[in-house]
Amino acid sequence: MTVAKELRQKSSEELVKLVIKLKGELLEYRFKLAHGELDKPHLINQTRRLLATILTILTERKLNWQEEQAKYKLLTKKTNEAAVNAWKQHLEANKAKLLKSRAKREDASKK
């Protein structure tokens, strides 16, 4: 399995913890490099790439979540619009009945 596939199987919380850990390691590597103590400078690039991969996965998840929320809002809006339209059609169809019942109530209240 590739690294990205393995990372995609982890939860978002685990990935965030890994991001924090990798940022700390990257900071440590940079300090060691500045002091000439880093024996394996390729670790900086590896860590940066891994960090970028994780951040990309987290961003994808965030965008997918936002898309799902937008779809849900659109669906509920369409559903609400359909319900309102159905109610308006019902009112138009029964307008005469409603007016008669209103007139009866008004007559009853006058007596």
UniProtKB/Swiss-Prot annotation:
Matches recorded under InterPro entries: Ribosomal_protein_uL29, Ribosomal_uL29, Ribosomal_uL29_CS, Ribosomal_uL29_sf
Pfam families, sorted: Ribosomal_L29
Example of a GO MF term: structural constituent of ribosome
Region (Unknown): 86-111
GO BP annotation list: translation
Renumbered residue ranges of the record's region Large ribosomal subunit protein uL29: 1-85
Gene Ontology CC terms, in alphabetical order: cytosolic large ribosomal subunit
Keyword entries, A-Z: Ribonucleoprotein, Ribosomal protein
Database matches in PROSITE patterns: RIBOSOMAL_L29
Family: Belongs to the universal ribosomal protein uL29 family.
Name the UniProt record assigns to this protein: Large ribosomal subunit protein uL29
